[in-house]
């Protein structure tokens, strides 16, 4: 519930007992002589025994008049209300409910829940008579069917002080636990948004993903949502009730998803929808059956020039998810398993589809995403758009320590507030230190990043130089055809790279296609790039000149580390029609000679990706036109300072020793 204060406006014809009802509620007894119109009354939280009660409830008494001023006052009060307590007392005022009052509320344009109250029974004997059922059937049910804004109806007596507290609770309940978002009374079934929300609750509660909530899982859900356990008889009754409707809803394995939905439909149908709301709010749903932006996207402070990566906790959660949904234990998630995994989410992330999923990362021969590819995809998504990962972790139920218990088999019996759950999700991420630049006579260049494990590489080169083949080789896939197809849209792939010494990082490689000029002119996009892979076709004499043209057109590229690569090295090498041959060219700009690579030589491909990763991690070594000593020169002042300190300390020690010797003599 988002209302800290509930405002109840009491409406009805003159003389139906509105003021008497309010007085009896406050005094807990009937007061015969009261003023015609009571002032607004504030009732504190402690007045109600419900743990979900608002901080305060304001009850506003009203009267209807043809006076323009009083009519405007009534309009204003109704527009400020959270719920309307509509009272009638006899046949005439009952007729006025459907003829005047309910159309009047609609004409005002308000969409408020209404509690219909019959304040007519002052004879004690009448409460137990059959007339009671007849009155409900004849008077109230037709109105309920015609006007869906009526949440509930109740018979009360101000004189006997009967059912007034219950009527007040129904008004609070109409705001705290509204039936309208959940249940379609005319159709007698839950609304689609309610079904979707409950399906997500079922998904997150079905810890072993067998399609049923076992007794243990039902108990854990009950304790998590309401802080108390079921009795054994309660579970038996629930199962029996569902099995009576359809045996498939509750079997020996537990309650099925359809059975769980049916159970909540029964709650709503019987006026126990506060139970359903208790479940939904535990899983952070708003009154509109959505997950709020505050929950999906908690604030994460990311300094300028910093990036966001997954933390060990985030990777662990994603590994656990992969293993849970790899039902056939073949080491890959097929289409069916992916569909099941993403069921509680909006679907496969749009970012993945934009990058031509599933061809963006590593998959097996059957097209199933491997664990390596799964983690690489999320690493790329987090690096490029961490808010997407943040939202999907929310949909999939990441809650810090609670997530560890969920996969380890421990009971998850502590519900987290929406704010706490959002804050716990931040533990799935780490923010890297801001990218720094070192100054030198030429343009700035980036300092060595020492806390990053995800890097971005732009693959640049002439048409037909082999860029697409290189990206396919990065994913350990052969090129499907030798027929050249120009890359139109940008293509991104991601995979892990194991470097010398066993350290692993993730590399996102982008071929820019026809958007190359736009990307290279965009400072923000260039800031995302950590290393450039300049490619040329070693068997095409006109291929290399394209690289020099790019560097001249976009001088800013020289502020990024780069690796030159001669592709198609298995073909006969041709002299390049350019002023300098590639080896001479790279020597002139003081970087390593081109690496000769062929997709038919796996070891050469592996070596290239290692060099790209190392260039991204140590950008000073791959920058064009840098003197060899410049990278080490940045350390020299500290080394000299350290050496001077050591010499000074030695000199002081020598002087101190000689002074002591002289003193003794």
From Swiss-Prot:
Cytoplasmic side: 1-634
Enzyme class: hydrolase
Localization terms from the record: Mitochondrion outer membrane
Residue sites binding GTP 1 per the record: 12-19, 61-67, 119-122
Binding site for Ca(2+) 1: 206, 208, 210, 212, 217
Gene Ontology CC annotation, any one: mitochondrial outer membrane
TM region(s), chain numbering: 635-655
GO BP term, pick one: heme transport
EC number: 3.6.5.-
Chain sites annotated for binding GTP 2: 461-468, 498-502, 567-570
UniProt GO MF annotations: calcium ion binding; GTP binding; GTPase activity
Membrane-topology descriptor: Single-pass type IV membrane protein
Keywords assigned by UniProt, alphabetized: Calcium, GTP-binding, Hydrolase, Membrane, Metal-binding, Mitochondrion, Mitochondrion outer membrane, Nucleotide-binding, Repeat, Transmembrane, Transmembrane helix
EF-hand domain location: 193-228, 313-348
InterPro entries membership: EF-hand-dom_pair (IPR011992), EF_Hand_1_Ca_BS (IPR018247), EF_hand_assoc_1 (IPR013566), EF_hand_assoc_2 (IPR013567), EF_hand_dom (IPR002048), Miro (IPR021181), Miro-EF-hand_domain (IPR052266), MIRO_dom (IPR020860)
Side Mitochondrial intermembrane, residues: 656-665
PROSITE patterns, sorted: EF_HAND_1, EF_HAND_2, MIRO
A Pfam cross-reference name: Ras
The protein's role, per its UniProt record: Mitochondrial GTPase involved in mitochondrial trafficking. Probably involved in control of anterograde transport of mitochondria and their subcellular distribution.
PANTHER family (UniProt xref): EF-HAND CALCIUM-BINDING DOMAIN-CONTAINING PROTEIN 7 (PTHR46819:SF1)
Annotated family: Belongs to the mitochondrial Rho GTPase family.
Name of this chain's protein: Mitochondrial Rho GTPase 1
Organism whose genome encodes this protein: Yarrowia lipolytica (strain CLIB 122 / E 150) (Yeast)
Name of the gene encoding the protein in the UniProt record: GEM1
């Amino acid at each position: 519930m988002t209302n800290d204060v509930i405002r109840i406006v009491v409406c009805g014809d003159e003389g139906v007992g509105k003021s008497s009802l309010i007085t009896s509620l406050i005094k807990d007894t009937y007061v015969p002589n009261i003023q015609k119109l009571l002032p607004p009354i504030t009732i504190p939280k402690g007045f109600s025994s419900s743990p979900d009660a608002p901080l305060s409830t304001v009850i506003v008494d009203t009267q209807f008049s043809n006076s323009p001023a009083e009519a405007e006052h009534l309009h204003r009060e109704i527009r400020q209300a959270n719920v309307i307590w509509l009272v009638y007392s006899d046949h005439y005022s009952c007729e006025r409910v459907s003829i005047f009052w309910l159309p009047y509320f609609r004409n005002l344009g308000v969409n408020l829940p209404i509690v219909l109250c019959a304040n007519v029974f002052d004879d004690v004997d009448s409460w137990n008579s059959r007339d009671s059922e007849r009155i409900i059937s004849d008077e109230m049910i037709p109105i309920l069917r015609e006007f869906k804004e009526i949440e509930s109806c109740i018979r009360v007596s101000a004189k006997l002080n009967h059912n007034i507290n219950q009527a007040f609770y129904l008004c609070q309940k109409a705001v705290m636990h509204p039936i309208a978002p959940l249940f379609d009374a005319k159709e007698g079934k839950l609304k689609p948004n309610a079904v979707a929300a409950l399906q997500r609750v079922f998904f997150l509660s079905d810890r072993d993903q067998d399609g049923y909530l076992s007794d243990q899982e039902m108990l854990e859900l009950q304790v998590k949502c309401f802080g108390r356990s079921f009795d054994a008889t309660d579970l038996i009754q629930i199962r029996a009730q569902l099995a009576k409707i359809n045996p498939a809803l509750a079997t020996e394995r537990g309650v099925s998803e359809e059975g769980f939905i049916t159970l909540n439909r029964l709650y709503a149908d019987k006026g126990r929808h506060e139970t359903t709301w208790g479940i939904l709010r535990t899983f952070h749903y708003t009154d509109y059956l959505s997950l709020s932006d505050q929950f999906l996207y908690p604030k994460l402070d990311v300094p300028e020039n910093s990036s966001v990566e997954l933390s060990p906790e985030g990777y662990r959660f994603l590994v656990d998810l992969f293993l849970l949904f790899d039902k056939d234990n073949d080491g890959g998630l097929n289409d069916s398993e992916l569909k099941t995994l993403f069921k509680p989410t909006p679907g496969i992330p749009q970012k993945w589809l934009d990058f031509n999923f599933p061809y963006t990362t590593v998959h097996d021969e059957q097209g199933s995403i491997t664990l390596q590819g799964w983690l690489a995809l999320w690493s790329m998504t987090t690096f490029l758009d961490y808010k997407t990962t943040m939202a999907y972790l929310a949909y999939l139920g990441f809650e810090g320590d609670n997530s560890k218990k969920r996969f380890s088999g421990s009971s998850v019996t502590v519900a987290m507030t929406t704010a706490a759950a959002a804050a716990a999700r931040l533990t799935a991420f780490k923010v890297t230190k801001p990218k720094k630049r070192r100054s030198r006579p030429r343009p700035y260049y980036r300092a060595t990043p020492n806390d990053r494990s995800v890097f971005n590489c732009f693959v640049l080169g002439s048409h037909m130089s082999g860029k697409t083949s290189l990206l396919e080789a990065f994913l350990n896939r052969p090129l499907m055809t030798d027929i050249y197809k120009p890359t139109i849209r940008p293509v991104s792939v991601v995979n892990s790279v194991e470097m010398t010494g066993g350290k692993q990082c993730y590399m996102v490689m982008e071929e820019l296609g026809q958007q190359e000029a736009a990307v290279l002119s965009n400072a923000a996009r260039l800031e995302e790039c950590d290393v450039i892979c300049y490619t040329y076709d070693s068997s095409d004499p006109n291929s290399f000149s394209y690289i020099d043209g790019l560097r001249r057109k976009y001088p800013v590229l020289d502020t990024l580390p780069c690796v030159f690569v001669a592709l198609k090295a298995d073909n006969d090498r041709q002299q390049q029609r350019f002023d300098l041959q590639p080896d001479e060219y790279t020597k002139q700009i003081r970087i390593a000679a081109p690496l000769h690579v062929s997709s038919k030589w796996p070891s050469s491909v592996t070596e290239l990706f290692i060099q790209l990763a190392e260039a991204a991690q140590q950008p000073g070594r791959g920058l064009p036109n840098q003197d060899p000593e410049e990278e080490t020169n940045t350390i020299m002042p500290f080394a000299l300072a350290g050496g001077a300190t050591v010499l000074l300390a030695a000199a002081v020690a020598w002087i101190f020793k000689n002074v002591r010797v002289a003193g003794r003599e």
